[in-house]
Regions:
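Flexible, small-/acidic-enriched active-site or ligand-binding loops
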Residues: 185-211
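A short core secondary-structure module
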Residues: 133-187
Length: 327
């Protein structure tokens, strides 16, 4: 970790909005993309607690660097494949995700859906081609997809319609996770956006009549319509790991800088940090840092024990990021 931060110049990353090739290679060779991938697939598996600590440390250095560590190791293809992927999918995708050959994007958020995942409007129509193979025709507009501009593997949440009941699950097959590789006809990955003024890769993904075989369903055809379950389980854990880590990092960083400056800045011959009004504010910030970090440890420990705490995760996501912003 220390060597990574030494090599990563935060100013250069912010100015160029690009991760240098040599830094990307260093991260791949040292397991930064495989923290939730099993060793048998070339990963570097860690506990939820350990991942959270690493994400917090990286987030204190650079938004771009944070996104490159957080997304591959929280929400996205690696976690879902590890839980639900077929043996063939695991053998094909996971080693390439661990090595950085595949950079994942999590295709959930839309203009009218995000945390409200059930409201997605992305559609897929099930049909048989001239050879009798079952395929999907996908149309969708996704936005605010972190890493999208540099991604080459998208795990896409889409609502499937099966008018001929080819999959045997009724006309409305339900929300399904489909794997898309960059380069498919009709798939357009948009330019770099800055929705909150930060410099990490973020942008839209649009699909117009994108054709993929049914085998691209994450988990295989049997998991058609199981996307809602996958998303809720992934979000429950992911919300506890990544966003609280980055939010609490902001709280801690703000408290540290304010506390240090209050002891350097002097008025009336003493540091302003010795004045009661300033002391109160610095003390409150330090107390909030301690409380939020304790909640993070509690939540991550629960996930490590196999508990998926959706309510706790949602609370942590909301309040830690708000406090990090305000600090």
């Amino acid at each position: 970790m220390g060597e990574l931060l030494k090599r990563a110049d935060a100013y250069t990353l912010s100015r160029t909005r690009k991760l240098p090739d040599e830094l990307f290679t260093f991260m791949a060779e040292n397991g930064f993309f495989g923290m939730q991938i099993a060793k048998e697939y070339g990963g570097n598996p860690m506990s939820t607690q350990a991942k959270s600590c690493i994400m917090a440390k990286v987030s204190s250095h650079s938004g771009l660097l944070s996104a490159m560590v957080v997304i591959p190791n929280s929400l996205g293809a690696a976690e879902l494949l590890g839980h639900y992927g077929t043996d063939e999918q695991k053998q094909y995708y996971l080693p390439k995700l661990a090595s950085g050959e595949f950079i994942p994007g999590f295709g959930l958020t839309e203009p009218t859906a995000g945390s409200d995942a059930a409201s997605i409007k992305a559609e897929g129509e099930v049909f048989k081609d001239s050879d009798g193979e079952i395929k999907f025709k996908l149309n969708f507009r996704k936005r605010y997809i972190t890493l999208a501009p540099v991604s080459n593997l998208i795990s896409l949440a889409v609502r499937l319609h099966d008018p001929e009941n080819l999959l045997g699950k009724g006309e409305d097959a339900g929300i399904t996770e489909v794997l898309l590789e960059k380069g498919l006809d009709g798939l357009h990955i948009g330019d770099h956006h800055q929705p909150i003024g930060e410099h990490f890769p973020n942008g839209p993904i649009v699909g117009r009549d994108v054709i993929v075989p049914a085998s691209n369903v994450l988990g295989g055809e049997e998991y058609t319509g199981m996307g809602w379950k996958m998303l809720m389980e992934a979000l429950a854990g992911g919300r506890m790991v990544s966003l609280p880590a980055t939010g609490i990092c902001g709280i801690r960083h703000g408290a540290m800088i304010a506390g240090a400056y209050s002891m350097v800045r002097q008025q009336f011959g003493i540091p302003v940090g010795r004045m009661e009004g300033v002391e109160h504010k610095i003390g409150k910030a330090a107390g909030m840092t301690y409380a939020f970090d304790a909640a993070r440890v509690f939540g991550c420990s629960a996930v490590d024990k196999g508990i998926q705490p959706p309510v706790t995760s949602a609370i942590m996501k909301a309040y830690s990021t708000e406090m990090g912003r305000d600090t």
